[in-house]
Regions:
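Conserved catalytic-loop aspartate of Hanks-type protein kinases
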Residues: 186
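Catalytic-loop of the protein kinase fold
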Residues: 122-139
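Forkhead-associated
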Residues: 293-380
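ATP-binding glycine-rich loop module of kinase domains
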Residues: 21, 25-52
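Conserved activation segment of eukaryotic-like protein kinases, specifically the C-terminal portion
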Residues: 164-178
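Activation segment signature within eukaryotic-like protein kinase domains
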Residues: 110-111
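Short beta-strand micro-motifs within the conserved protein kinase catalytic domain, predominantly
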Residues: 70-81
Length: 394
């Protein structure tokens, strides 16, 4: 990079990427953020559409104001395209803010702000297409309930007026709609981020390590349509039911079944989830082999981001269901409240762990359990109990 670009002095390199590099630059005593889009030959005719899309969006984004990044100007030098943006001082990204803040009310306020931003860009006929926490800047603002305001950035692959250049997405936040992009595509990804904001977990990720991902959102539609599998109807016991339900609805594979931003906003502000989002399909129970990961109340066993791993969910009739899951979220066995409460191991057993009921190893035959029964997860490899808990049906 040259020391001067179109009158901007390059101060430091911030990031180098496959498609663009970014720099802190200065002009007239003011600092700016410069993006240099490189290697246009790899895009051929797409590059011209990319530039046209960007130039269409710049005035639209400026008209939205402080909720989105400000693009000061764009220009070309030696065949390469550049954008100059406001340099946001004292900002962190949403990922880092979440890691340092577990206050639900403040996270809820940020979720409401995010919803307002999406309403604003959709109102300008823009689909963002690449939403993720790293694209959201967080700055202090005492006028907000959370004490911060958020600014949505990085509209490189956003779609104005339906003019798609490329289908893109980040692992864990990808697009499941293919070329059928619409505002509801952003709703799906927003649902993932809402789950992180309000439930403390990405529904498609066990840990943040790439190799530990359960499956990508791009495969989600296949899971639902071919395997009749759905997310746990209850994500987190601490979530208000309406918030839980609206998050799950955002992740519907079919666009038409996802809620509108107005419906999401209503729920975040205290209204019940709309009736039209129901009924949902009930997941089929499967019992694959593999290490058991039992959901246990009040522990952080086995997963970094869960407060509790023995999850009380509900079925389509709102009856309590306790599901035992392996590390890939496949259901191994189930405890259902009714006249009898049955607990069973899968017929093929577990690879390394067994379940004990009141000290006796369980077979695949369902056994009635009751409040006060002692459950142990026993490691056959280590010869010790991994975790112990007591059945409590509410």
């Amino acid at each position: 990079m040259e020391s001067m670009i179109n009158g901007y002095e390059v101060i430091e390199e911030i990031n180098k990427g496959a498609f663009c590099d970014s720099y802190k630059v200065r002009k007239g005593g003011t600092n700016y953020f410069l993006k240099a889009y490189k290697d246009p030959t790899s895009m051929s005719e797409d590059y011209e559409q990319f530039k046209q899309n960007q130039r269409t969006m710049i005035p639209l984004l400026k008209s939205i104001g402080g909720q989105v990044e400000t693009i000061v100007e764009d220009f070309e030098v030696k065949g390469l395209y550049y954008q100059v943006k406001e340099f946001i001082t004292g900002a962190t990204n949403l990922r880092d803010w979440l890691n340092d803040n577990d206050n639900y009310d403040e996270r809820l306020d940020v979720a409401i702000q995010f919803c307002e931003i999406l309403k604003a860009i959709h109102g300008k006929n823009i689909v963002h297409q690449d939403l993720k926490p790293e694209q959201v800047m967080v700055v202090k603002d005492s006028s907000k309930k959370a004490g911060v305001k958020i600014i949505l950035t990085d509209f490189d692959w956003s779609v104005p007026n339906g003019n798609v250049v490329r289908i893109v997405g980040t692992p864990g936040y990808g697009n499941i709609d293919g070329t059928n992009l619409s505002y509801k595509s952003d709703i799906f990804t927003f649902g993932i981020i809402l789950c992180e904001l309000l439930a403390g977990v990405n529904p498609f990720v066990i840990t943040e390590k790439e190799e530990d991902r359960i499956f990508e959102p791009e495969k989600w539609k296949e899971w639902v349509t071919e395997k009749d599998y759905v997310l746990p109807i209850k994500i987190n016991d601490d979530l208000p039911k309406s918030v839980n339900d609206i998050i799950v609805a955002c992740l519907e594979p079919e666009q038409s079944k996802r809620p509108t931003l107005d419906e999401i906003m209503g729920v975040l502000q205290g209204k019940p989830a709309p009736d039209r989002l129901y009924p949902r399909k009930k997941a089929k129970l499967r019992a694959p082999s593999g290490d058991v990961m039992i959901m246990v109340p009040g522990t952080g066993y086995g997963r970094k981001h869960f407060k509790e791993l023995f999850g009380r969910t509900t079925d389509t009739e709102s009856n309590p269901v306790y599901k035992y899951l392996d590390k890939n979220y496949a259901v191994l066995s189930v405890v259902q409240e009714g006249e009898d409460i049955l607990l069973g191991c899968p017929a093929n057993g577990f690879a390394k762990n067994k379940i004990k009921l009141n000290g006796i190893e369980m077979s695949s035959k369902p056994t009635m359990v009751k409040n006060g029964d002692k459950i142990s997860i026993f490691s056959t490899g280590k010869g010790t109990d991994i975790v112990n808990f007591t059945i409590e049906v509410i």
